[in-house]
């Protein structure tokens, strides 16, 4: 895909949704961090359903840590990999409480040092909370980038590296949100909705439905 097409696609998505919002519910930096950790291999719907109850009981590093591992597991048991996630959350809560004075760190190195926080999670936190022009590549973003030929790659790392190079700076802040929403509701894994796609004419997917 050429530079002009990419710019047109992003312009269309920008006009349609100037201020895209993440679909995870949160009211603090720490709540978002926990929600993103929980969202790995899960859906935002399940995470929101879970945190709606959990955050009424505990929603700070101190209260989560005091809740304890077993009680936390009970609250998040409907989420995939809940045993591992519970342990990571307890450990991360303790580190943020004791090392960072209950404040979520705002740089990649410190974020990725937290249990349960990888590059994708760090990118989301940096982007949403701290307005950094990072691009998180999840399954939706990966699929849309490859399918449309916006930025092809065999893995998320390659796609992210390409996106950093080809996405104009003015669009980088919202890129992740636009593409994840497009992948979640339009360019879905199954039953692709080409008939209502805003970027249909610019898409280079050879099997798109006319």
UniProtKB/Swiss-Prot annotation:
Binds 1 [4Fe-4S] cluster. Residues 108-127 form the HhH domain. Keywords: 4Fe-4S, DNA damage, DNA repair, DNA-binding, Glycosidase, Hydrolase, Iron, Iron-sulfur, Lyase, Metal-binding. This is Endonuclease III. Pfam families: HHH (PF00633), HhH-GPD (PF00730). DNA repair enzyme that has both DNA N-glycosylase activity and AP-lyase activity. The DNA N-glycosylase activity releases various damaged pyrimidines from DNA by cleaving the N-glycosidic bond, leaving an AP (apurinic/apyrimidinic) site. The AP-lyase activity cleaves the phosphodiester bond 3' to the AP site by a beta-elimination, leaving a 3'-terminal unsaturated sugar and a product with a terminal 5'-phosphate. GO terms for molecular function: 4 iron, 4 sulfur cluster binding; class I DNA-(apurinic or apyrimidinic site) endonuclease activity; DNA binding; DNA N-glycosylase activity; metal ion binding. One of its GO terms (biological process) is base-excision repair, AP site formation. Transmembrane segments: none annotated. The keyword Hydrolase applies. [4Fe-4S] cluster binds at residues 187, 194, 197, 203. Signal peptide: none annotated. Belongs to the Nth/MutY family.
